[in-house]
Every structure is written in structure tokens, then in C-alpha cells.
Design a protein with these regions (language model features):
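Tubulin/FtsZ superfamily GTPase core signature
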Residues: 1-146
Length: 146
């Protein structure tokens, strides 16, 4: 019986062992759009539980953007909204994102996965989120909207 147990024992070969020192990790960016999205990004970042994630805040309301704790901030629609937001007009939100599309694309470059988070009750989140999701797709990132 003892010899049978020895035969049935399996051992992992060196090739089958998981490599704990892997250099492969996804480049993840979480983008908060508008007031609701920026609040969500601030909460996530301030929780301290998420490591290896870059947080980006995008808004037309300059004052609200200042309060967001994301390290990377993009103030969109400067010429269009003068920093006062979109007044709940999604078309203004879309135009504001288009106005800064190249900066958005540059920020998203290199991302493997982009989460776009926004509240859909206002103009910036509702109007700019689809433009930002398109930009993320253009840079080759898997894009998830929340």
C-alpha cells in the first residue's frame, strides 16, 4: 500500500509553478466624468484600497474639479462653459468633451482597461461619457461604463 501512495503522489514541475514575480499587470484607469463621476473617483481614491489604478477626473465645472482628489484632472469645455458646468445640458457636455478630445486621448494612452463612471442626471456625465468611452476604445482599451 505504501508503494502505491508514492506512485499516486503528484508534484508540480518548475514549469507548472505560478510565477509570483510576473511583470505582467494591466494598466487600469478609472475616469470620473461630471460631478457624480468625480465624486465616485474621489471616494475610491480616498478609500486607499485600490492600488495600481490611475484615477482621472473630467469635468466642465472648474470649482467642482478642484475639490476632486484625483491626481490627473482634465477641465473640459473652457471656451464653451467658462468653467460653470453645462446646466444639465448633455449636448453641451458632448461638445465640451469633443473640444478636449486630444487631451483625453493622450491621457488614456497606454491603458489596457478603462472604467468610465458618471451620474447620468447632469449634462457633463450624460453628454461627455460616450465621447470618453469612444476615446478609450480608440486607444485600444477595454472600456466599461458604470
Amino acid at each position: 500500500m505504501a508503494s502505491r501512495n508514492k506512485k499516486n503522489k503528484t508534484t508540480r514541475s518548475a514549469a507548472a509553478k505560478p510565477d509570483n514575480k510576473s511583470n505582467y499587470s494591466a494598466n487600469i484607469k478609472v475616469v470620473g466624468v461630471g460631478g457624480g463621476g468625480c465624486n465616485a473617483v474621489s471616494r475610491m481614491r480616498d478609500s486607499g484600497d485600490l492600488r495600481g489604478v490611475e484615477f482621472v477626473a473630467i469635468n466642465t465645472d472648474a470649482q467642482d474639479l478642484d475639490f476632486c482628489s484625483a491626481r490627473k484632472k482634465i477641465y473640459i469645455g473652457k471656451n464653451l462653459t467658462k468653467g460653470l458646468g453645462t446646466g444639465m445640458n448633455p449636448e453641451l457636455g458632448r461638445q465640451a468633451a469633443e473640444e478636449n478630445r486630444s487631451e483625453i486621448i493622450e491621457t488614456l494612452k497606454g491603458a489596457d482597461l478603462v472604467f468610465v463612471t458618471a451620474g447620468l442626471g447632469g449634462g457633463t456625465g450624460s453628454g461627455a461619457s460616450p465621447v470618453i468611452a469612444e476615446a478609450a476604445r480608440e486607444v485600444g482599451a477595454l472600456t466599461v461604463s458604470i
